[in-house]
């Protein structure tokens, strides 16, 4: 017998939809349709809006009573994760999130690794996404600048490591050059 969808299930499902709409790279990573030609917004304004949205979800979630054990686990897991996001933001980490493994610096490039490339439409989406990289990185830079204004900047070693990564990505045989060649080859084969 199929379990009936509860209010907590509905809220959880809506959260995934909202996160996919707000973060195109998340949507791509989970195979959720929409935003294939867009990039994430890492600006201070987007970070602040995310906090407002998370607080609204927490308030709704806290008002709901679990219908069963599954709901109880869902509610607790969501609250744990969402409260952690609030704590991360309040700590200022969102404004110094730069490192050599997993930060927006890698995410902006990494989304291209997981984006579909099988069709003409896929490549059109990738071209659109590529054109939005600059805006995404400018928003990210503004967030890092906000952290620096608060005297809360990334560690110098992390900064130098990310600079080295960016330098490598932008070489003649780096990611974006190779990506553009693949686009050209695909264009010749399928257009």
Regions found by a protein language model. Name each.
Residues 1-191:
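N-terminal maturation segment of proteins
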């Amino acid at each position: 017998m199929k379990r009936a969808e509860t209010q907590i299930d509905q809220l959880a499902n809506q959260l995934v939809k909202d996160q996919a709409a707000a973060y195109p790279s998340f949507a791509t990573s989970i195979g959720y349709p929409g935003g294939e030609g867009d990039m994430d917004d890492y600006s201070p304004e987007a970070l602040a809006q995310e906090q407002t949205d998370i607080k609204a979800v927490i308030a709704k979630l806290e008002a709901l009573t679990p219908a069963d054990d599954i709901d109880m686990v869902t509610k607790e897991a969501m609250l744990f994760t969402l409260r952690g996001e609030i704590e991360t933001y309040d700590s200022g980490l969102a404004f110094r999130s730069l490192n050599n493994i997993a930060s927006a610096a890698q995410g902006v490039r990494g989304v291209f690794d997981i984006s579909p490339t099988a069709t003409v439409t896929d490549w059109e989406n990738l071209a659109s996404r590529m054109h939005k990289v600059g805006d995404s990185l400018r928003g990210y830079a503004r967030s890092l600048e906000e952290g620096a204004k608060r005297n809360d900047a990334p560690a110098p070693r992390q900064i130098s490591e990310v600079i080295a990564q960016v330098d490598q990505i932008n070489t003649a045989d780096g990611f974006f050059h190779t990506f553009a060649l693949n686009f050209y080859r695909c264009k010749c084969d399928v257009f």
